[in-house]
């Protein structure tokens, strides 16, 4: 790789890290607002319960990846920090939080799918508090099974301060290749395919059947939200696949790309919902003290919020 390419890569990662840290308070405040408003319509719906937990996973992933991978790459932490017996913990943590995000994305897509295709059963039968709690337990417990195999081996880390990236390799080369290739296929192919099919079905239904006050605006909001989520996960999956297919010593460039895309993904949920939904923006600014509280009209905004 040329020196110019290295300079561009490290600059992009520095910029994405700085922007993510600036956006972190916004994400935290977003979760706080949804939590405070959780018993007030329309925020007392399963959709916003799922949003809270997805945003928590996003925040934890951003903090974890920054402190355990980026800062050592930037020279903030000494590399000896990763030469102890617990070297598997950073990798396991990333796998756990990444799949917690993935399940959150899938469950939100399923929620939107049932809301559009089966609105009556969606409200009255399927999305009960018990079902929502069960899905949230699945979101946080199932990733444990994805990261469990990692504890059967050790990892070695090599931090490149020139590229701002990190290379890690399991002591068992065969395990390293098989495990990360399998995870890359799950994240990059299976999850993206599921989300794409669900949102594709939503778009078709909204375009041909659903009647709302502003159908064009609703379709645009749905399309933009789904597009950002899908593109982020698609790009993340491509980086994961390329990294898994590349020998560890040569995989640094894909790891750098992965961390940049991950920064975008971790900040997309809160920012997209704030950008595309006026009631959420009003609640956000009200808690900042910009506007006084006048309540949220569920009559005017419920259908729009339910469609995001």
UniProtKB/Swiss-Prot annotation:
The chain crosses the membrane at residues 15-35, 46-68, 88-108, 135-155, 184-204, 222-242, 256-276. Gene3D superfamilies: Rhodopsin 7-helix transmembrane proteins. InterPro entries: 7TM_GPCR_serpentine_rcpt_Srv, GPCR_Rhodpsn_7TM, Nematode_SR-like. CDD domains: 7tm_classA_rhodopsin-like (cd00637). The keyword Cell membrane does not apply. SUPFAM superfamilies: Family A G protein-coupled receptor-like (SSF81321). GO terms for cellular component: membrane. Keywords: Membrane, Transmembrane, Transmembrane helix. The keyword Nucleotide-binding does not apply. It is found in: Membrane. It is a multi-pass membrane protein. Belongs to the nematode receptor-like protein srv family. This is Serpentine receptor class V-1. The gene is srv-1.
